[in-house]
A protein has these predicted regions:
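Hydrophobic transmembrane alpha-helices and their immediate loop junctions
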Residues: 1-209
Length: 209
């Protein structure tokens, strides 16, 4: 285990010890069915990324599982702009497609479980499209900027947008806490989620050996 609290399962899989505790907490209560649905939605999202990475012969390095996110590390330097963009947005597209399909089934066979599956997929799609560097939306935005501007302009444009998005993210987090009248549980979850995502941005444990 390294200083980041990572357990090395294999050369291609690492998991945060806090993720294990989070999974135990989710499945310990009566909401185990809904926890399984959420994990299935997350798995669908990440599997879509991995599928296209393999399809386009990108060099796959490892998957790191955090309590509030999963990082897929791969060498995409040999991929074209279009293929890399497809790999980046594959997860969000799979969630969007799952949402559309489940909407159809919800109309025919309404159920709370199916409704939750719909909400999970639309939530994952929306959150991952946030234009922060460690989300799919931020990675896609970076690709688009660097493909359309010279290197210097692209660098400063991307940095400016990244900072603006980070400020917006923090403001939204504060709004969530304020909306709950600063409920201690909500505050703890929001702060931990924010720290986890920014830690993911600052450090990539897949490069540590």
């Amino acid at each position: 285990m390294n200083s980041f609290g990572m357990i090395k399962i294999s050369e291609s899989l690492r998991i945060s010890i806090f993720s294990l505790f989070a999974l135990l907490f989710l499945f310990a209560g009566q909401g185990a069915t809904y926890a399984a649905i959420f994990i299935a939605s997350v798995t669908l999202h990440e599997a879509s990324h991995i599928y296209f990475l393999y399809r386009y012969s990108a060099k796959f390095l490892c998957v790191t599982i955090y309590p509030f996110g999963i990082d897929i590390n791969a060498d995409t330097s040999r991929l074209s702009y279009k293929k890399e963009l497809i790999c980046t947005l594959a997860g969000c597209l799979s969630n969007a497609l799952s949402f559309i399909v489940s909407c159809t089934f919800m109309f025919l066979f309404p159920s709370p479980v199916l409704l939750f599956f719909m909400l999970c997929n639309v939530f994952l799609c929306a959150v991952n499209l946030i234009p922060l560097s460690f989300f799919d939306g931020g990675k896609a935005l970076r690709l688009i900027i660097y493909d359309n501007f010279d290197i210097d302009t692209a660098f400063y444009t991307h940095k400016a947008l990244d900072i603006a998005s980070a400020v917006a993210f923090l403001c939204f987090s504060f709004f969530i806490m304020a909306g709950s009248d600063f409920n201690l549980s909500v505050v703890c979850v929001v702060i931990y989620a924010s720290l986890s995502t920014f830690a993911l941005y600052m450090k990539n444990p897949c490069r540590e050996h």
